[in-house]
């Protein structure tokens, strides 16, 4: 293993494109060998992905139209952190309630990942939510159309295996929990 430095030095950062939910950022950077290059990436901030378990052990899932792939997508509740959240745990509670109308007795962080750090700065924080019960109405964003359902955990795991659960965030959450369960929780 070489001791050569790997870090790039950011010389300039500018937003090339901005819209609700993300930005395209262009940076001028100096590589360790002195070469100056430009680098574009998607900047979308931190998000939470929640695996909500009902008292009977079923998983609360959402079905949502995804315009980019032009189909209904079955997924775990997920969304970006908001300034009013206070902390990531609060964001997990909020997203669960907003998207599903369910509330959890407790949330526990499973893991955090950078799903595409070659071209995006996104961080997904995964949570398991226990004791989830329907307590109210959804509070959806203007551009969300979401239907709520429940599914057996084993059915979701099988859907990942067969390719029927195609949402990458959700597939990772289901498989992480299948592999590590509560013992994989980090806080």
Please state what every model-predicted region is.
Residues 46-78:
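A glycine-rich, hydrophobic loop/mini-helix early in the fold
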Residues 8-49, 55, 64:
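Acidic, metal-coordinating catalytic segment for phosphate/diphosphate chemistry
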Residues 15-20, 85, 114-124, 182:
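Acidic pyrophosphate-coordinating catalytic loop
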Residues 2-8, 72, 109, 117-125, ...:
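Nudix hydrolase/Nudix homology domain
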